[in-house]
Design a protein with these regions (language model features):
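Bacterial N-terminal signal peptides that target proteins for export
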Residues: 2-14
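Short, functionally important structural connectors and interaction interfaces within domains
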Residues: 13-16, 46-49, 120, 277, ...
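Residue-level signal for mature regions of secreted extracellular proteins and peptides
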Residues: 17-18, 79
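C-terminal motif of bacterial Sec signal peptides marking the signal peptidase cleavage site
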Residues: 20-23
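C-terminal soluble interaction/assembly domains
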Residues: 25-28, 47, 58-60, 64, ...
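Short, low-complexity, disordered segments immediately C-terminal to signal peptides
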Residues: 28-39
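Secretory/export targeting leaders with adjacent low-complexity proregions
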Residues: 45-289
Length: 388
């Protein structure tokens, strides 16, 4: 009898062979690659709950969360799960909290998310759209390249042959007739990539944090800004640089924030390359037109500050409406509906979300300090089977 780990590895091997023979042509997805996770979740991951079990929200948060979620319908209008609720929601006034509540309670059921089938508390973090100084050409100060998708990067969608592996992808490059792992971040930093350079930054830490956030802007010398969004990833697992600092005895676990990591980097410039090599994952970007809207997440709709979240799509399908209960770093309650519109390499697990806080330094401070406990409920269309 084959155990699940061996079976999963064999599937990878079979698919690699098929992919190479087929030429490995595919369209680059927007989702962030994650290390393999179990594809079958316990049924108790989704625990049916009553509407009365949800913590109350203000009318303003209800309206803002509804509007953020409804923007997902531009991508979901033909989706088997969400087409009907989206069609109904189009006629609901976002100025009428009572009408929004009526729609939600009539069309959607409530399911509490449970880690391991029983644990209600999970981790809620934050992210934002950073703005960094840079240039469109290399200069004496701007020497750190931001790469677009490499020409030789191959992406294999596992679900094309194995539906139960939905959302899982392999990435690499073809050498001869063999698909090999793509270069890790350290190799790319040392040797470069076979990819266009979209912009140049002044600090390698800026690039690392840009990759962690998944999108950002480059502020040019003339004041104009270039918007960058996640395009692809090199296929290597994400390793938190904060964890490396803890393992090295440089920071205490409870002290790890973006500000603390940057302060360490400024105090230890000679060790910054070592720090960056500890995370083999490398994100490639695409230039997007500048816009007052938020950056586009994995669902390819603009993110809404405070009301869009990144999730583990193997648990929560993109486009889902969630009810979030957590706190800000200062303890202020955050209770609101949020839209699952993005993914992230570090976002894995049943009760796990990354809340988008907006653009710039203030949003960055809030996002960087946020490591809160929280509870999540999924609002799922009535009569529709739960995700597998």
């Amino acid at each position: 009898m084959i155990d699940s780990a061996t079976f999963f590895k064999r599937k990878h091997c079979i698919l690699l062979a098929v992919a190479v023979l087929a030429g490995c042509s595919t369209t680059a997805p927007r989702t962030v690659s994650e290390a393999p996770t179990p594809v079958t979740l316990p049924a108790a991951t989704y625990a049916k709950a009553a509407w009365s079990a949800l913590p109350p929200v203000s009318d303003s948060d209800l309206q803002a969360g509804f509007v953020a979620w409804r923007s997902s319908c531009t991508r979901l209008k033909n989706d088997a799960v969400w087409a009907k609720p989206c069609a109904t929601a189009a006629a609901v006034s976002d100025k009428d909290p009572a009408a929004i509540r009526q729609f939600l309670q009539r069309d959607l059921d409530v399911y509490a998310l449970r880690a391991g089938g029983h644990q209600a508390d999970g981790l809620i973090t934050g992210y934002y759209e950073p703005i960094y100084a840079g240039s469109l050409t290399r200069t004496d100060k701007a020497t750190v390249p931001v790469y677009g998708t490499p020409d030789d990067l191959v992406v294999v969608q596992l679900e094309s042959l194995y539906p139960e592996l939905k959302g899982k992808r392999l990435r690499g490059r073809v050498e001869g007739k063999v698909l090999k792992p793509y270069d890790d971040a350290g190799t790319i930093a040392a040797k470069g990539a076979n990819a266009p350079v979209l912009a140049w930054l002044t600090d390698p830490m800026d690039l690392q944090l840009l990759q962690i956030q998944g999108s950002g802007r480059v502020r040019l010398a003339d004041g104009k800004q270039v918007r960058l969004a996640y395009a692809e990833q090199n296929g290597h697992p994400y390793r938190a640089i904060g964890r490396w600092l803890v393992d090295q005895g440089q920071l205490k676990k409870e002290d790890v924030t973006m500000d603390a990591i940057r302060a360490w980097a400024r105090a230890n410039p000679a060790r910054v390359p070592e720090l960056l090599r500890s995370n083999p994952s490398y994100v490639f970007f695409v230039r997007n037109p500048d816009s007052p809207e938020g950056p586009r997440g994995s669902l390819n709709v603009p993110l809404t500050a405070g009301y869009s979240v990144a999730v583990d799509r193997s648990v929560v399908p993109l486009g889902s409406l969630l009810w979030l209960s957590t706190t800000r770093p200062d303890g202020t309650p955050v209770v609101r509906p949020v839209a699952a519109q993005d993914t992230g390499g570090a976002i894995a697990g049943e009760v796990r979300a990354d809340l988008y806080w907006g653009s710039g330094d203030a949003a960055g401070k809030l996002a960087g300090d946020m490591k809160q406990k929280g509870n999540i409920w999924m609002l799922w269309p009535k009569g529709v089977p739960l995700p597998n």
